[in-house]
Amino acid sequence: MKIIVVLAVLMLVSAQVCLVSAAEMGHSSDNELSSRDLVKRFFLPPCAHKGTCGKRSIESSEGANGGE
């Protein structure tokens, strides 16, 4: 079972590398944007889609400061 999980992760990583290289090689801005959108859609954490990643880090740092 663990072998299947490892293979699945390796396939996802290789797919990401292919998308990134395709975005870098593409000369058309449309192709670059679509490839970047795919990378963002599939390989970034969910908070990145909502734009809350920065807010979370700010809130957590404020909570840490308030706790002290």
UniProtKB/Swiss-Prot annotation:
<feature type="signal peptide">
    <location>
        <begin position="1"/>
        <end position="15"/>
    </location>
</feature>
<feature type="modified residue" description="Cysteine amide">
    <location>
        <position position="53"/>
    </location>
</feature>
<keyword id="KW-0878">Amphibian defense peptide</keyword>
<dbReference type="GO" id="GO:0006952">
    <property type="term" value="P:defense response"/>
</dbReference>
<dbReference type="GO" id="GO:0005576">
    <property type="term" value="C:extracellular region"/>
</dbReference>
<keyword id="KW-0165">Cleavage on pair of basic residues</keyword>
<keyword id="KW-0732">Signal</keyword>
<protein>
    <recommendedName>
        <fullName>Riparin-1.5 amide</fullName>
    </recommendedName>
</protein>
<keyword id="KW-0964">Secreted</keyword>
<feature type="propeptide">
    <location>
        <begin position="16"/>
        <end position="41"/>
    </location>
</feature>
<feature type="disulfide bond">
    <location>
        <begin position="47"/>
        <end position="53"/>
    </location>
</feature>
<feature type="propeptide">
    <location>
        <begin position="57"/>
        <end position="68"/>
    </location>
</feature>
<keyword id="KW-1015">Disulfide bond</keyword>
<keyword id="KW-0027">Amidation</keyword>
